[in-house]
UniProtKB/Swiss-Prot annotation:
Main location: secreted
Name of this chain's protein: Beta-2-microglobulin
Family statement drawn from the similarity comment of this UniProt entry: Belongs to the beta-2-microglobulin family.
Assigned keywords, A-Z: Disulfide bond, Immunity, Immunoglobulin domain, MHC I, Secreted, Signal
Keyword flag Membrane: no
Length: 122
């Protein structure tokens, strides 16, 4: 599975670079949310979805109290017409009082790594 994902990501990146003249640089639109209503103490899935970005090189990290959460799964890099890309990263979690969850995004269009915070639906 890892080799397949790596191959697909490399292929998409190569295709994007071949067609650089067809795309313009674009910042990622970032959405961080939970699969179910965010309730403290209830198992859930934390999701970070980034879309509309170019070039394709991007790094996503799901964080709990500013520390990367182990075991997160990442989708294959995909693109829309105009060579704008989208990617999703998710992980199982059980939110507790006092914990802070965020998605850290690194992309060439951002001056620095940027954190986007998840807020429970209370």
């Amino acid at each position: 599975m890892f080799l397949r994902s790596t191959f697909v990501a490399a292929l998409v990146a190569c295709l994007a670079y071949i067609h650089l003249g067809d795309a313009t640089e674009a910042m990622p639109k970032v959405q961080i949310y939970s699969r179910n209503v965010g309730e403290l103490g209830k198992p859930n899935t934390l999701i970070c979805h980034v879309s509309g970005f170019h070039p394709p090189n991007i790094k996503l990290q799901l964080l709990k109290n500013d520390v990367e959460i182990e075991g997160a799964q990442q989708s294959d890099l995909a693109f829309h017409q105009g060579w704008h890309f989208h990617l999703t990263k998710s992980v199982a979690f059980t939110p507790k009082e006092g914990e802070h969850y965020s998605c850290k995004v690194e992309h060439s269009t951002l001056r620095e790594a940027t954190r986007f915070t998840w807020t429970p639906d209370m």
